[in-house]
Amino acid sequence: MKNVFFPFLLSILLFLSCANPGSGPDGGPYDETPPRIVRMTPSFGAKGEKAKKITIEFDEIVKVENAQEKIIVSPPQIEMPEIKTSGRKISVNLLDTLKENTTYTIDFSDAIVDNNEGNPLGNFTYVFSTGAEIDTLEVAGHVLQAEDLEPVKGMIVGLHSDLADSAFVSKPFDRVARTDGAGHFSIKGVKPGKYFLYALSDMDGDYRYQRGEKLAFSRDTIRPYCFADTRNDTLWADTVRIDTVKQVNFTHYMPDNLLLLAFSEQNPTRVLLKTEREPEYMKVYFTSPSTHIP
């Protein structure tokens, strides 16, 4: 009997251990490495460039998430660019006519991720110029709801070099950016000058204000500038202990802390409810005392 029982018990234990999915191999460590750019055509920062198609190649298969919500081209494109992915390549085809002597930026935000784990490339902006120079100034800040100071996501923030009051409704912005989930924006590729700063929900995608859209604006004119600065950079020996604290040189772009308060303009429709006049009675008003009876 013992010769039969023990082999039977052993077979049951083996079956249970094989049926337990948690006891198998875990497939190795999770990949947290973002995709890496290996080639860009035209090259990053190209000058005098007339090509309207940009190709970016990576070291692994990538995909683009929520392109219409995250990717924005500046100067603004009335006709949305074509964005395609093919294996390790992303291509952007600009359909609008390129302006002469203009710096173009394509802000991908965190839209580019690897195909398997979805690790984002990070805040990547591709830059080229149709002229001999590249404008490098930046303007940054936040857009909050005026009534509760909550961040506003997806607002279009733009600069106007035309300081006329009518430019906001009659012309598209010179340079644009889009707010992220924290309400933060960063307008890049700005040339030196004097600007008005606006933000709008831009429901129809024409980069100008239309009645009914949420808006925000700065009361003061903006003059972008930059200066050489340093910041502390911490190197960690592990997750707890600091190994080294060193100073790093960088270019500080200003202004970098602008605050715009977004609101919806109230335009209630007014109707005439009633008119009243006492019978056989009339009032006459004059701008100054009369010296004689008319």
Task: Briefly describe each language-model feature range.
Residues 7-17:
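Bacterial N-terminal signal peptides
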Residues 1-5:
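Positively charged n-region of N-terminal signal peptides that target proteins for export
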Residues 18-182, 186-189, 194-200, 212-220, ...:
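Acidic, low-complexity Ser/Thr/Gly/Pro-rich repeat segments typical of extracellular/periplasmic
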Residues 206:
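Acidic carboxylate motifs that coordinate Ca2+ or other divalent cations, activating on Asp/Glu
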Residues 209:
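An amphipathic, aromatic/His-enriched active-site/gating alpha helix that lines ligand/cofactor pockets
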